[in-house]
Regions:
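Short loop/turn motifs at secondary-structure boundaries
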Residues: 71-181
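Intrinsically disordered, low-complexity linkers and terminal tails enriched in Ser/Thr/Pro/Gly
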Residues: 1-90
């Protein structure tokens, strides 16, 4: 799809963008329902490089919210856990592992996997997922066999790469799955 969008304020045109379907992320199988998001309000509206497909991790759209591909000035790559201990016992207190991220560029893909203390992969959270420039994802403690993982030490391995396969970031973050004994 292609078209032109006009922005008016008090009947005066203040901005406009003419876009083409090939502005969507090139590795999407289907761009139907995927929003194009402006990366920076400071760059030209008609500059193709200032637009990117909304991140898969937020449902390919951000109506009423900050764009998933919005570029924060001064952002550098960062990955952090909200807490390094969680207890998925449904008591309403730290039941999920929350992983926050921020990247300095848009259009990055990522793979997130969980390993146990013996180095065995127990769960792939996602693979080749188009990420926003900032956001979070979670793990509920359920392993690849759809069973609750046992109490112990685990490692999150997050690999972030560009479309051409270049590794942007590879990080291992240890954390603890706690519970009642």
């Amino acid at each position: 799809d292609s078209g032109t969008v006009y922005l008016f304020y008090n009947s005066e045109q203040i901005d406009r963008v003419s876009y083409l379907e090939d502005w969507q992320f090139s590795l999407l199988d289907n761009s139907d329902g995927v929003s194009l998001e402006r990366i920076s309000p400071n760059a030209s509206s008609n500059q193709q490089s200032n637009w990117h497909s909304a991140a898969e991790s937020i449902g390919f759209a951000t109506p009423g919210r900050v764009n998933s591909q919005y570029q924060y000035v001064g952002t550098t790559e960062s990955i952090s856990l909200q807490k390094d201990v969680f207890s998925p016992d449904q008591d309403g207190f730290e039941d999920i592992l929350v992983v926050n991220y921020a990247f300095s560029e848009s259009g990055l893909l990522a793979r997130a996997r969980i390993f146990d203390d013996f180095g065995r992969e127990i769960k792939t959270l996602f693979s080749n997922e188009l990420m926003g420039t900032s956001g979070f994802f979670t793990w509920d403690g359920v392993n690849g066999d759809q069973a609750k993982s046992p109490i112990g030490i685990y490692v999150l391995v997050l690999e972030v790469f560009s479309v051409d396969g270049g590794v942007i970031l590879a990080k291992k973050i240890p954390f603890t799955l706690a519970g009642k004994l």
